[in-house]
A protein has these predicted regions:
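Alpha-helical transmembrane segments of multi-pass membrane proteins
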Residues: 1-236, 240
Length: 243
């Protein structure tokens, strides 16, 4: 939707990736703090509001009257238009993985002590969607059709999410067996630094490809695919874990 206005600018792609990574971090932070402070029972009501909020802006469409600046850097404009168009839906979706992991860990399902396999499932879905969209979806559906299909799919997803929430125990006082001591702040800072390194490399390599090789969106997805595939490998359970 933005390409007709911005063209094939690598700066626009990088701005979009910064936007989505920042909002993803915000969604994780929301899930962590709200579940910690409210517990599962009260969190359900807050999370229901968060997940229903995107319905107010669906189907996703380009706002009327918005056009990028003709002579200045479009980065700020790109961030603003993304916030208006997909800010609420993406923030809601960014909360799903950590929330589902918490619910799963507080359910009666086998393997609840290691809910991180859901990260692998989410990363696998991201890789499949990223690689299949240019070849299986975009050539056969217009933007309006895609927007409406996404809106209908999101509504169905909400129904499934509500069913999952009922499987989690309501008591926020229950503790997972084998819980470790909280990490120190020095450990947390190191973890954030380690996570920032591949993100910075992703942006830098993508910008280099766009500036020095070709300003071609299909090339830009290669670094992102490798980034997601690495996350998939890291979060997938190993044979030793299954033993």
């Amino acid at each position: 939707m933005l390409l007709p206005s911005l063209g094939g600018s690598p700066a626009a792609w990088n701005a979009a990736m910064v936007f989505f990574q920042t909002l993803l971090l915000a969604g994780y932070l929301y899930s962590h703090l709200s579940l910690k402070w409210l517990g599962i029972a009260r969190h359900r009501f807050l999370h229901a509001a968060v997940m229903l909020l995107p319905l107010l802006v669906l189907p996703i469409a380009m706002p009327a009257g918005w056009s990028p600046p003709a002579e200045s850097d479009p980065t700020i404009w790109t961030l603003l238009i993304l916030a208006v168009m997909v800010g609420a839906p993406y923030f809601a979706l960014s909360t799903v993985s950590p929330t589902l992991q918490h619910w799963f860990a507080h359910s009666d399902r086998p393997g609840k002590a290691e809910p991180y396999m859901l990260y692998a499932a989410g990363n696998a879905g991201s890789v499949i969607a990223l690689l299949s969209y240019p070849f299986l979806l975009e050539p056969f559906m217009g933007l309006k059709q895609q927007a409406w299909a996404w809106a209908v799919t999101y509504f169905g997803f909400l129904v499934l999410l509500a069913m999952c929430s009922l499987k989690a125990r309501s008591s926020h006082d229950e503790q997972i067996t084998g819980k470790e001591e909280p990490a120190s702040w020095s450990q947390r800072v190191r973890w954030m630094a380690y996570a920032a390194i591949p993100s910075v490399l992703l942006l830098g390599v993508t910008r280099h490809i766009g500036d020095e090789i070709a300003s071609f969106p299909l090339l830009w997805i290669i670094p992102l695919t490798l980034y997601l595939a690495t996350c998939l490998l890291y979060t997938s359970p190993s044979p030793r874990d299954e033993d």
